[in-house]
A protein has these predicted regions:
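Serine-dependent carboxylesterase/thioesterase catalytic core
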Residues: 315-411
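The conserved beta1-alpha1 loop
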Residues: 249-255, 336-338, 362, 436
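Membrane-anchoring hydrophobic segments
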Residues: 1-144
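Cytosolic-side transmembrane helix boundary signature
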Residues: 179-222
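Catalytic active-site module of serine/aspartate enzymes centered on a nucleophile-bearing elbow/loop
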Residues: 48-54, 460-511
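Short beta-strand/loop motif that positions the catalytic acidic residue
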Residues: 427-428, 434-440
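Membrane-interfacial entry segments at the cytosolic side of transmembrane helices
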Residues: 85-92, 154-159, 207-221
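Active-site catalytic motif of lipid deacylating hydrolases and related acyltransferases
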Residues: 246-330, 365, 374-377
Length: 511
């Protein structure tokens, strides 16, 4: 009996041993998602595609490795279903074929989010994978090798939530441990394989008596948790701050335009400034003024600019900032959103312009992955080609992105570019605060903190809306007036810890 049981499970144990060996020899990066390589389908397929998209150095290598891995996945599933006969092999191949499309879409969105630092792609990718795992994860283990019958049985048995929900909780917990304690990542691979085996074994047992009720209860709990999450993320508007001396220079981020950027709509009056004290940076250079549009105040200086101007070479942007910031009334406070953080930091850290305080809104401490130039065989070649192919689709959501513009190539396409900028310390006399968005935290594999006076508690506000949020206003008023920040809940970054293992290999894991 024991020999028969071992005979069934040894391929899963061998797969775990192979993953451990590959990680130990640096053939695959040791990132928290490593544990997903021995997870239930289709999470295992998601891990395969994340790794291959981000690390395959050429199309031939990608295709050969994908074919080999796909064949191994099909054989492993067939064996776990009972043996390598034609019917089980055909079932496994059909299952992975059905899941390939949505899983590839999720993996590509995942890799894109890390490459272009756009969390609005990351969260839908994770949600899609979660839906696929919960709805399709039980399908192969329903005791039949006919896919349609297996799908029907899965739904009739309530998606086996009594097995899948605890299993998913274990996977999330293992990923969180690997994220917090990287040294345990490789030892956790066999643990993940054991969890997978136990889940498969549990799904071969009879389902609950009332599976529909269990599924309904799970959906109700999920909806209730979502409502609570949304209802508790608001911030109370702070009391207006006292009048501030000097001037405030505001810089919008990438793909903005004159008067068209979230930071243009910042309530500068609540911060303690008047319109006569406020200046708006132009990516087109000095001029006699720009269209006001969404800006709180008339824009009296700078030339009108559009999204294409924000894509000019990085050093040109730094030069323009130096030119427009020099000579403004002191004390000079600079508020920079997103991409503009790197521009401002470069100018101030190199001593090219003198400022008194920096408000860094939605900064990214690193560019964790990058992507190779066209036609260059380097890790990420396949992903980069797909990114360039998909780039025109960004116009449909009014977020034009061209991965080969000078700014994108220098900062996003080059892994470590942001780190090299932010590695230079600011002058000692410059006060600075950093306010990240909690939704961006998964894209910061090496941490969110900058070398500044105050690293604010991550705000539960989406990245684009951060500069006009009550969270930013409160943090800024406190910082400018020397008041301490409110306590930061220890759970504020727990979401990022739980989901970061669903990202691509990035940051320190690649180094």
């Amino acid at each position: 009996m024991r020999e028969g049981r071992w005979r069934r499970w040894w391929p899963l144990a061998a797969a775990a041993a192979l993953v451990v060996l590959l990680a130990a020899t640096n053939a695959v990066p040791t990132w928290p998602g490593l544990i997903h390589l021995v997870a239930l389908p289709p999470l295992d397929q998601f891990a395969d595609l994340r790794f291959l998209l981000s690390r395959a150095p050429s199309w031939p290598v990608f295709l050969v490795l994908f074919a080999a891995v796909a064949a191994a996945r099909v054989a492993l599933m067939a064996w776990l279903l009972g043996g390598l006969d034609a019917r089980r092999l055909r079932f496994a191949a059909l299952f992975y074929t059905v899941t390939f499309g949505p899983v590839l879409l999720a993996a590509f969105a995942d890799a894109t989010a890390y490459a272009v630092l756009y969390s609005r792609l990351f969260w839908p990718a994770v949600a899609l994978v979660g839906i696929l795992v919960l709805t399709l994860g039980p399908v192969p283990w329903q005791g039949t090798v006919r896919l349609r019958v297996a799908l029907a049985l899965t739904w009739r048995r309530g998606l086996r939530v009594e097995v899948l929900v605890p299993y998913c909780a274990v996977v999330l917990a293992l990923g969180a441990v690997a994220e917090r304690i990287p040294a345990l990542t490789v030892p956790l691979v066999p643990v993940s394989a054991v969890a997978t085996g136990l889940a498969i074994r549990a799904m071969h047992r009879p389902a609950m008596r009332r599976p529909g009720a269990a599924l309904s209860a799970f959906v109700a709990a999920l909806v209730a948790a979502s409502i609570v999450f949304v209802a508790t993320r608001g911030y109370e508007e702070p009391e207006p701050g006292p009048p501030q001396p000097g001037s405030l220079l505001i810089l919008s981020g990438i793909n903005s335009a004159s008067g068209r950027g979230a930071i243009h709509a910042t309530d500068i009056h609540r911060l303690g400034y008047t319109c006569e004290q406020v200046y708006y940076f132009s990516y087109a250079g000095p001029g006699d003024g720009q269209p006001q549009r969404d800006a709180t105040c008339p824009i009296r200086t700078g030339a009108p600019y559009g999204p294409s101007d924000t894509q000019r070479p990085f050093q040109e942007q730094v030069d323009l900032f130096v030119e427009q910031a020099s000579g403004l009334p002191r004390p000079l406070v600079v508020a920079a959103h997103s991409h503009a953080v790197w521009v401002v930091w470069e100018a101030v850290a190199t001593g090219r312009v003198e400022v008194d305080a920096l408000l860094l809104v939605g900064p990214f401490p690193s560019t964790p992955t990058g992507y190779p130039p066209p036609g260059v065989n380097q890790p990420g070649r396949v992903f980069a080609d797909l990114l360039r192919l998909a780039a025109p689709a960004t116009d449909l959501v009014r977020f034009h992105f061209d991965p080969e513009t000078p700014a994108a190539r220098e900062l996003l396409g080059t892994a470590g570019a942001a780190e090299s900028v932010l590695a230079r310390p600011l002058p000692g006399a410059v006060r600075a605060s950093s306010l990240p968005s909690a939704t961006d935290l998964p894209l910061m594999p090496d941490g969110r903190e900058l070398d500044v006076e105050r690293n604010e508690c991550p705000a539960r506000v989406a990245h684009p809306y951060l500069p006009k949020s009550a969270a930013f206003e409160d943090a800024t008023i406190r910082f400018l007036n020397g008041r301490p920040p409110p306590p930061c809940p220890p759970w504020r970054d727990w979401g990022a810890v739980l989901v970061r293992p669903f990202g691509v290999p990035a940051g320190q894991a690649l180094r």
